[in-house]
Amino acid sequence: MISRVQKTVSSLYHKSAFNDKEKVRKMKHLEIELKTLLKKDEYDHLKDQFTGVTPVLQKNYYIDTPDFELREKKVAMRIRTFEDWAELTLKVPQSVGNMEYNQKLHLKDAEDYLSKEDIPQGLVLAELAKHGIQSKKWQVLGCLTTLRYEMQTAIGLMALDESQYFDMTDYELELEVENHEQGKQEFQQFLEENQISYQKAPSKLVRFVKSMKNS
């Protein structure tokens, strides 16, 4: 069966959204994502549909306080690095989706913050303070590396990920949408058309921490 992606190939942008540094996500925006874990053969099948997309390597460094205050308050923070730039992101759960706060960083500055286990002044620290988190000490938990294929489709921004952390490799499909209910229906239809069985996908941070505890 021809998938929704294949049917709408003329409407796709055949390059990763992260290839263009001018397309950095808004400093603050509501992220509504649908996702499923994939088997390796399902991942390979879907990758064939991302024709012309250049994959982007991104490294996610997860950060918390030494006593895991962020995890306790159910917020997540990371520095994500790309080939020549980086960003600091805070995710705060909402009734639907996560509110994201993003600060663009120069790659060298990001590397310095990571080596010193520190974070820069700005939007993210200000938002943390609103949640009662004003730590002077930070801890880099480790790194999860993702090879991402990303493109805009008729049903939303789709990302196909292969992630590695500790001794784990997993595969995941994400769809970022504007409307949760409509997006959920279209995502399910896409999975059915591609004969993919839905597997609940905890966040990358949750998967990372679980493996960290078991390592």
Protein language model annotation of sequence segments:
Residues 13-215:
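Phosphate-end processing signature that detects enzymes handling 5′-triphosphorylated RNA
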Residues 7-8:
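Polybasic, lysine-rich low-complexity intrinsically disordered segments
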